[in-house]
Amino acid sequence: MKQLLRIMILLLGLIWILAWAAAGRFDDTPSTQDGSESPLPSGEIAAPGERDSAKTLRIQIQGEVQEMDMGTYLLGVLRAEMPASFEEEALKAQAIAARTYTLYRIRGGGSANHPDADACDDHTCCKAYLNAEQAAANWGSMAVYYEEKLARAVSETDGEVILYDGAPILAVFFSSADGSTQGAGDVWMNDLPYLQKVDSPETEELVPNYYSVATFTAAEFKSLILAAKPDADLSGSPEGWIRDIVRNDSDYVASVTVGGVKLRGNDLRTILSLRSPSFTVEYKDNAFTFHVTGYGHGVGMSQYGANILAKQGLSAEEIVQHYFSNTTVGYYDG
């Protein structure tokens, strides 16, 4: 009887091995940058969790309102907003942040830009969104692997939200910091207790295109400034157009005076399409040259920073609590 039992166990093990081999499980599979993960077998797309499935949203996509559950929406956001090659814990952190941001906006009454929808696919208003077909065209041969990976990031954080005083926060994020983030009050009008300066681990070696340079002739600079700020006085020598650069304790430009008009650093970044408000500027040979560090407004969660922290072993929940001060991660049914 014992011999028969051993034979049956061996046969079951052989069947299991053959099934996995047929699914390509033992093939050389794509991995993250440190080669630490293995994907689910092809075709095993994680289903949205119970909490996300129970939340129906109205999303305006390319001008048309579509109904979908929270999990489906978040998967589309992840496809568009964070490199799928990133660590799984970073992708989970992104899913938590995007879910939180969406609930925060809904709780606040939505946007006048889309009164009939909870959110839209315009990243300047809400969050970018890609459907599976669009993402697959971008990913090529990695499409199945990446789709499975992002679906896991959503399903394994089902319903998780970043909370301050029991309510969803304004969970903003950006690409890469200059060594630290900056507080909301440094960029926008209102300071928020959970959007404060924190350290961020980016370096030139760890982030592609960490440094960038933007050059404008005096005529180009004048045209861009006057289009946005017609009251600026740029009649004198260009050497005197930019004055009084003030930096905050994160070393981002807090304010700068251009042609007599005081601007926030992030405003000048927007006007000139600079990658970040962390910059220096020099005028030489009738041109302004901006040396820029990082990418994005610098408030909230740095995506590249999140990926580096994930490589260092932090969980998604630890990552979001690092970037969003004084918060907890839990559920919100409001």
How should each PLM-predicted stretch be described?
Residues 1-334:
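Conserved, single-site charged/polar hotspot
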